[in-house]
Amino acid sequence: MRINKYLAREGVATRRAADELVARGKVLLNGRVAVLGEKVNKGDKVELRGKSSPKKHLYFAYHKPIGVITHSPQKGEKDVKQSVPMDVFPVGRLDKDSSGLLILTNDGRVTDRLLNPEYDHEKEYRVRTLDPIRDSFKKTMEAGVSIEGYQTKPCTVRKTGPKSFMITLTEGKKHQIRRMVAAMHNTVVELERTRILNVRLDDLKPDAWRPIEGKELDTFLAQIGMKELDATR
């Protein structure tokens, strides 16, 4: 497999971050500096310069408030990493204007598996709209709607009020819920992610975090195909 994928599976970094490590000459393959795109074969020895032992894998649930940035903050913007004192990164994105559950980890394998479009990983959201929801809204949304030429996958919708609903998706296109609601001639005014697979936001306060551990972690890892429990975590 390619060296960036290998490093991600070993929990060193995401594939993109692994490419950066390789480009900076921080990765050794069989004692020499690795190059981008190289393949790692059975029996090869991969080392990180300056790293002598495997790191402990960490997993956290974080309640991202509105206004906090998950990736590439600009000057003056608050980054998720400012709220969590550990060396972890967010798995996936959550819009600046949205709030709710983010999973933070230093295990690159989680990013690769959770964001892989080949798998259907449930994510649940609480949504409030500007205008009242039409009678046809639930049926149409659940069947899938066309957003700029793309037909969304079937989903589950539960109306919770005249202008509110819960939605469970198994995909994560950019601004998907906002675009789906716009296709239904309405506007999202509040969007909060409440669940990723078995990990729930529950009563976690905004800008607070908690560890994912024990049975909750075992179930989460099993649901993304990581049934083996990593001895380094």
Listing of model-derived features with the role each one plays in the protein:
Residues M1-R233:
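Basic, flexible Lys/Arg- and Gly-enriched helix-loop patches that mediate nucleic-acid binding at interfaces
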